[in-house]
């Protein structure tokens, strides 16, 4: 290892490597694929610092390499373009809130604690669930935590998920449960794009710890007859988990109404911009059953009174958490997405119940308009005839790679490629009629 001006203590590094029985630093990264390892020396810290104007110029040069789009991307699959009220950014920028760290000291954090309490209350109302924590990192993490809750409650070692799950969420889940040696079983998808409910009868429920359903599913299809799933789970001592798009609840049944034990999701749709994958916020909620609540990881803010009878907010049930009792903690999560959760609370407060319903209706109308235009122009057909929300899977008559490349050349980002002729399109309230028409017309010219 060569000396570096920022890392001068080479002898100490060698001592540490010797202590853990490693010859060099590279051995610590053997699990990283070889083609991802940088083979040249990274020239950082050798030259004298640049003036501010030079730094700004260099960063602008890098930014110029970004693709300039005429319209918001028609790309969803877990991250969605939505209109964000400007007041959200203003509130988040206030110094009292501008931190993502947990407010451990209630005597100096009443503002942020109340903001998180309002987030929990608003989210509980939206989901029609009883208890909501003050956020996780993202949807995948919340799902994994919910599955581990189920395992701790009943001790069974199989987890049932649908084939129509977001593949990134599945990767996170499989990584988390591998340490507990839990087995993941998939429910097949039928010809209508929905889960095959008959498959449940073939399962040995004595082995099933939890069952997870995504609504709408990864392909945008709205699942139906979910009461059958919750009834089956309740009769067989299986923890039922529903992953849900928050904005879809303006039109479809909530997890609470359907009788699910746990609800998970992502707050990205609620006032958070697209930003190279994050930060977003993971939603985790349960019904009021202390068997569930005691196993719920993450921070929970409660309202109480101080010794003088004044209303106050503080973290509650902290013995569930690893900083309180590490060896018996429900999770190793040590913080949350407080700032993002606050943005979610502001967004929900601004829209209210009617606003959420109107927005969901507008998204529904625009996405169905886009599909109709694509079918009217005989570009292909939708893969499933079932109803959908916000996203739909389209099967083209010709090669989608060529279509997508041409769209990018024209400053339009199409849907997510699922196969040689298949793509998943997302349409929300930010996609105007003109944007949709231009998308369809461009595809018609090159299809």
UniProtKB/Swiss-Prot annotation:
Record-listed E.C. numbers: 1.4.4.2
Record key words, sorted: Oxidoreductase
Database matches in HAMAP family: GcvPA
UniProt keyword Transmembrane, yes or no: no
Superkingdom classification of source: Archaea
GO biological process: glycine decarboxylation via glycine cleavage system; nucleoside metabolic process
Function: The glycine cleavage system catalyzes the degradation of glycine. The P protein binds the alpha-amino group of glycine through its pyridoxal phosphate cofactor; CO(2) is released and the remaining methylamine moiety is then transferred to the lipoamide cofactor of the H protein.
Organism: Metallosphaera sedula (strain ATCC 51363 / DSM 5348 / JCM 9185 / NBRC 15509 / TH2)
Swiss-Prot/TrEMBL catalytic activity: N(6)-[(R)-lipoyl]-L-lysyl-[glycine-cleavage complex H protein] + glycine + H(+) = N(6)-[(R)-S(8)-aminomethyldihydrolipoyl]-L-lysyl-[glycine-cleavage complex H protein] + CO2
Record's protein name: Probable glycine dehydrogenase (decarboxylating) subunit 1
Subunit structure: The glycine cleavage system is composed of four proteins: P, T, L and H. In this organism, the P 'protein' is a heterodimer of two subunits.
Record-linked InterPro entries: GcvPA (IPR023010), GDC-P_N (IPR049315), GDC_P (IPR020581), PyrdxlP-dep_Trfase (IPR015424), PyrdxlP-dep_Trfase_major (IPR015421), PyrdxlP-dep_Trfase_small (IPR015422)
A Pfam family that the UniProt record links to this protein: GDC-P
Enzyme class: oxidoreductase
Gene Ontology MF terms: glycine dehydrogenase (decarboxylating) activity
Family: Belongs to the GcvP family. N-terminal subunit subfamily.
């Amino acid at each position: 290892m060569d000396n570096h001006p920022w890392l001068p203590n080479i002898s100490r590094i060698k001592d540490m490597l010797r202590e853990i029985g490693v010859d060099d630093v590279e051995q610590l990264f053997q699990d990283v694929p070889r083609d991802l390892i940088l083979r040249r020396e990274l020239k950082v810290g050798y030259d004298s610092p640049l003036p501010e104007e030079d730094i700004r110029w260099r960063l602008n040069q890098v930014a110029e390499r970004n693709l300039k789009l005429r319209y918001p991307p028609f790309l969803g699959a877990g991250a969605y373009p939505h209109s964000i009220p400007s007041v959200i950014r203003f509130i988040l920028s206030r110094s009292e809130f501008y931190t993502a760290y947990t407010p451990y000291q209630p005597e100096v954090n009443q503002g942020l604690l109340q903001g998180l309490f309002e987030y929990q209350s608003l989210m509980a109302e939206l989901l029609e669930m009883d208890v909501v924590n003050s956020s996780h990192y993202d949807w995948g993490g919340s799902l994994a935590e919910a599955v581990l809750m189920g395992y701790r409650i009943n001790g069974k070692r199989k987890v049932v998920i649908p084939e129509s799950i977001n593949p990134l969420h599945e990767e996170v889940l499989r990584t988390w449960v591998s340490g507990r040696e839990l087995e993941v079983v998939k429910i097949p998808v039928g010809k209508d794009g929905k889960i095959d409910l008959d498959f449940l009868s073939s399962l040995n429920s004595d082995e099933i710890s939890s069952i997870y359903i995504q609504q709408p599913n990864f392909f945008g299809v709205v699942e139906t007859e979910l009461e059958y799933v919750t009834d089956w789970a309740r009769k067989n001592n299986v923890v039922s988990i529903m992953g849900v798009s928050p904005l879809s609840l303006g039109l479809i049944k909530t997890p609470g109404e359907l009788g699910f034990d746990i609800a998970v999701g992502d707050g990205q749709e609620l006032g958070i911009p697209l930003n190279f994958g994050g930060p977003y916020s993971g939603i985790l909620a349960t019904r009021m059953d202390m068997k569930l609540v005691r196993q719920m990881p993450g921070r929970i803010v409660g309202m109480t009174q101080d010794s003088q009878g004044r209303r106050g907010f503080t973290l509650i049930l902290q013995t569930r958490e690893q900083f309180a009792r590490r060896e018996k903690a429900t999770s190793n999560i040590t913080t949350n997405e407080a700032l993002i959760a606050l943005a979610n609370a502001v967004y929900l407060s601004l829209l209210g119940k009617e606003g959420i319903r109107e927005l969901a209706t507008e998204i529904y109308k625009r996405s169905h308009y886009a599909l109709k235009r694509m079918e009217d122009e005989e570009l292909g057909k939708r893969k499933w005839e079932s109803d959908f929300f916000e996203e739909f899977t389209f099967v083209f008559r010709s090669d989608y790679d060529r279509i997508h490349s041409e769209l990018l050349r024209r400053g339009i980002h199409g849907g997510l490629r699922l196969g040689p002729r298949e793509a998943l399109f997302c349409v929300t309230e930010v996609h105007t009629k003109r944007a949709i028409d231009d998308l369809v017309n461009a595809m018609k010219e090159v299809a």
